[in-house]
Amino acid sequence: MTDNKKYDVVAIGNAMLDVLCEVSEPFLDQEGISKGVMNLVSRERSNNILKLVKPVKETAGGSAANTISTLAKLGLKTGYIGKIADDQQGGVFKKDLIHDSIIYKTAFLDKGNSESTGKCIVLITPDKERTMNTYLGATEYLSDIDIDEELIAYSEWLYLEGYRFDGQESKKAFYKAIEIAKKNKTKIAITLSDSFCVDRHRSDFINLLNESADLVFCNEDELKSLYEVEYIEAAQKLIADTISCVACTCAEKGAYLFHKSSIRRISTKKVSVIDTTGAGDNFASGFLYGLSKNFSLEKCAALGNEIAGEVLTVYGPRIEKSLTNFIKVNA
């Protein structure tokens, strides 16, 4: 970290609990659920889905919060901004952040609001693909007054979760955070989050990335959706003209690193996959950890692949085991 910065990464995202459930392929068809993406659902729909499945695990989640959690376990100084209700689920979420020594000061949802803390029902099919059904709840009410200027100003990186574009108030909050970051020379990383999310907000995303992003995280489907191309290589010139660096994950193929006019594939080791939830979030953790150590972009991507590989072998979006050995090897 530079002398005037107190934090390595501060993130803004959807604060919610993840409920992981194993289901069959026919279940998704019967319930009309689009596979492999994030489906926005109402509280009623969320409750109805839960009546039909048997949860395997319940854990604090949210894409950016998952990234921040792993960064904290890697020893980085982190902060998080996201809205929860003052309820049991919100208490679990907040407790997990505090346990990981993450700075979290966002006020609870106003007591006059009946929404509960957000919940994401993650349906895992036999091929280990995850399909998310997200009730946003309290997180939808994140607004510009929740943006902690000091937290962002004193951070090396601001990490923005694309899912938060699903809401006008939180979109305003994003732009306020970006303004603060630019004013204080805080670098900006943005994750595209989901191909359907990109479809909903393509124009806004492209403008945001072109004008503000120092680093973009995405997967293959999200990148193709963003630039409306059939192959990710076709996006190279569009990226080179506007964005300094894009790290694009491609499942077992590893990751593609777009930097200026070059494109490189960084391979990954094969692992026994149990659940793909949180793989992209943890890739971002490894990459940002590498940047904090001033590693090359290629090594950052390799570390991203390694950390993503760790979470693929467990249920849920977060690594629970100690990362001490990883830190020793990559100090």
Regions found by a protein language model. Name each.
Residues 4, 151-153, 209-210, 240:
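A short, aliphatic-rich alpha-helical micro-motif
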Residues 68-77, 123-125, 290-293:
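Alpha-helix C-terminal capping segments
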Residues 78, 104, 188-189, 246:
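Hydrophobic beta-strand scaffold residues
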Residues 105-111, 122-168:
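Conserved phosphate-binding/catalytic loop of the ribokinase/pfkB sugar-kinase fold
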